[in-house]
Amino acid sequence: MTTNYIFVTGGVVSSLGKGIAAASLAAILEARGLKVTMMKLDPYINVDPGTMSPTQHGEVFVTEDGAETDLDLGHYERFIRTKMTKRNNFTAGRVYADVLRKERRGDYLGATIQVIPHITNAIKERVISGAEGHDIAIVEVGGTVGDIESLPFMEAIRQLAVELGRERAMFMHLTLVPYLAAAGEVKTKPTQHSVKELLSIGIQPDILVCRSDRVIPANERKKIALFCNVQEKAVISMKDVDSIYKIPQLIKAQGTDDLVCQRFGITAPEADLSEWEQVIYEEANPTGDVVIGMVGKYIELPDAYKSVNEALKHAGLKNRLSVTIKYVDSQDVESKGTEILEGLDAILVPGGFGDRGVEGKILAAQYARENKVPYLGICLGMQVALIEYARNVANMEGAHSSEFSKDTKFPVVGLITEWIDSEGNVEERTEKSDLGGTMRLGSQLCHLAKGSKARELYGNATVEERHRHRYEVNNNLLPQLEKAGLKVSGLSADKKLVEIIEIPNHPWFVAAQFHPEFTSTPRDGHPLFEGFVKAAGESVRGELEK
């Protein structure tokens, strides 16, 4: 199969939404029957984002095969059906590490290792490898044109475009077209300078996507086309919208997909966007409202919980409910008490690391349990629910996780020293293992217990969900917890690790060790989130059994 490439770059400022724009174009092309994949090239020196602070970088998105990747891959999976893998995201750090490893082995036969050709060749090889088997590969380069870190990536895609030829490669560039109230007009000069910077690298954009808070007038689009050397019809106006799921229709209406198909000589049926029209309709026509409290430690940057936020919205679509997320700092729960949780229709405690704010999360789980408020715990959110239950129901005074307390008498959560990975290999870890890439990662099989809420929600005896953790339920203390009424409703493939817990005498209390948010999409939702938001809606209407 011959693969065609669209390289996506950004200019003027960061955070323009390259990932959303690229994913939206991918969604349209997929809706035309084409097989599409996406890639994100990150210029930072970290090997992957696994050890980066969520408040700096946002969430770490985990793929099926266990890669810790940029959050943009979450956008990709929410917009297209193709599942991302470790081939779909790589960093400068990963590339340099691979090249240096080869140099140490002597693979380069004594050559002087340089950015050109060794680093650029390594980048090109990864891009070609990741695109195999698809009609179109959309490749997003992180950062902003002009950044010193991104230069090797820019040079690599420039070379690749030359090698592939115009009939197989094109460039899409996102820029900002600001509106100046004092002048009463949009300004195109930043876009002109951004394209000039791109041209200095040797890249001529074929499509310009212009971000603005309003529709860019035709005369300004004509001006941009003239000074940036692109066709007028290839200047796409992307105004701010109240939902990212409207973007596919917005750029489809301007014929962006036709430009791509014409360039590559592809004959494909018109895009069927009926699924996206349904998503937009459901989003615009809720029949009720719910307020979900998210109790976490990284709330100053909502992107730290990006997939959770989106999964809650998706569940709202499926239940025809408008979901408002109220972010609650778990440290505030510690200092101000659980009174700040009053009025919430449901409580969610997401994943996290470190002991800061953990007691606040435990208090949130206790509040939800005692007040019959729907509760969903994810990863650490399951562990704190378990700790709370052990302390206050199973009479295990001082119970804790060994992650936070080494001398607790009841370590109900402990370090996993051994488990079976997704390929059936035994993984072993100790407290001395590196932080990066050493967790239980990726998609794992889970057995669901008969008669459990989890099995009712999923409608299957087994499911596969994605993990990212190194601590688990201590099986030695599990009998005491089960005797006190805790229900284990999900077990790992070898039935040695607890994956889901429930509290039977509670209207809706479910917690999972895995991350269900990574597989939720606007078109399909996710069973756990749908059940959780449905319970929140029933709580509002007074229909939830107490």
UniProtKB/Swiss-Prot annotation:
Something else known: CTPSs have evolved a hybrid strategy for distinguishing between UTP and CTP. The overlapping regions of the product feedback inhibitory and substrate sites recognize a common feature in both compounds, the triphosphate moiety. To differentiate isosteric substrate and product pyrimidine rings, an additional pocket far from the expected kinase/ligase catalytic site, specifically recognizes the cytosine and ribose portions of the product inhibitor.
Stated family: Belongs to the CTP synthase family.
Listed name of the protein: CTP synthase
Gene Ontology MF terms in the entry: ATP binding; CTP synthase activity; glutaminase activity; identical protein binding; metal ion binding
Organism whose genome encodes this protein: Aliivibrio fischeri (strain ATCC 700601 / ES114)
Domain Glutamine amidotransferase type-1, first and last residues per copy: 291-542
Catalytic activity: UTP + L-glutamine + ATP + H2O = CTP + L-glutamate + ADP + phosphate + 2 H(+); L-glutamine + H2O = L-glutamate + NH4(+); UTP + NH4(+) + ATP = CTP + ADP + phosphate + 2 H(+)
Binding, UTP: 14, 187-192, 223
Gene Ontology CC annotation, any one: cytosol
Assembly, per entry: Homotetramer.
